[in-house]
Each structure stands twice: as structure tokens, then as C-alpha cells.
Amino acid sequence: TIRFGAAGVGGMYYPFANAYTELMSEEEKGINWKVKSTAGSAANLRLLSDNYIELGIAQADLIDEAYYGKGTFHSGKYSGYKAVASLYPEACQIVVRKDSGIDSPDDLEGKTISIGAEESGTERNARQILEVCGLPDALVDTENLDYTQAADKLEEKKIDAFFCTAGVST
């Protein structure tokens, strides 16, 4: 069995992994594939390094950090994996309600926001953007939610915004 680390079911990695494994199952009879829901990029790199999965999707910036032991992976380099392909470009977006009054990242000060699932590429990108905007954790109330949870809480007005790093077509 080949275990494929995707991400949460609400993002693009999970459906991509399912489509990929369906195609591979048709092409390579006798190989069993299992898509694993994970927190995302950083988690997949850790799971690959720990031999819990054999294949995983990760953002290029986090692959670089893991390889060199910096940023999210400052505690040490990760090894035991290699890049196979570049899938598609991704962009980090900030999602808000139309009536929120939030027009730029600077408007997030004092707001409750989801920075993505813990160990996800979205979390890393959100923290980078907040840092550049001069918004440390003391100035925003952050929650670690996957996309589905964040969208639900945004609709219920329990959070003010959420970060989403996903394929450009999202």
C-alpha cells in the first residue's frame, strides 16, 4: 500500500490526491493506494521523513525550509524524501465577509482570524504575511482551522477572516 499525504478535505490537495490515486490504480494494477488526510505541507514533510507516508504534497517554500532546516523547520533538517514534480502555482488569499470592513491586511489588527490548520503551508504563509504587516500574535487573535471549519466560522461570524493558500484557480 502506498500512503499519500494530502491535506484537509476542504482544500485542493485532497481532491488532487484522490484523482491521482484513481488514475494510478487504473494504470498500475495490484498497487493499493490510500489517501491520508493531514494538516498539509509541513505535516506531510514530517510524515515523509518519519516514513508514515510514501508520497505527499507540499509547498515548495516549505520543502526548501525542511531541506535546509530553517523557518518552520528551524529545529533541524528533514531528510528521506525528494521532489517528484511541481503540480501547480498557489497563492495565499485572505477571505473576509463582504460586510467586514476589512480591505487590507492592516485591517486585521484586533480581529479573530484563522491562519490555517497547524503544520499547513497556509499557517506558514499567514504568519509570514502577518509578520511583514507588523501584526504579531499580540495584535490579532489567531485560530488554527482547516478551510471548511474556517468558512463555517466566517459565515457564522465567529471569525473575521481566514487565510487560504491554494491553487491559483481557487
Description of each model-found segment:
Residues 2-27, 31-32, 90-156:
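Bilobed "Venus flytrap"/periplasmic-binding protein-like clamshell domains
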Residues 21-22, 34-75, 149-153, 169-170:
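Pocket-flanking alpha-helical
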Residues 31, 49-58, 111-113, 155-164:
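Alpha-to-beta junction loops
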Residues 60, 144, 166:
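Residues that line or immediately flank small-molecule/substrate-binding pockets and catalytic motifs
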Residues 74-87, 92:
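A structural signal for short loop-to-beta-strand junctions that line the ligand-binding cleft
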Residues 84, 165-169:
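Soluble extramembrane regions of membrane proteins in the secretory/endomembrane system
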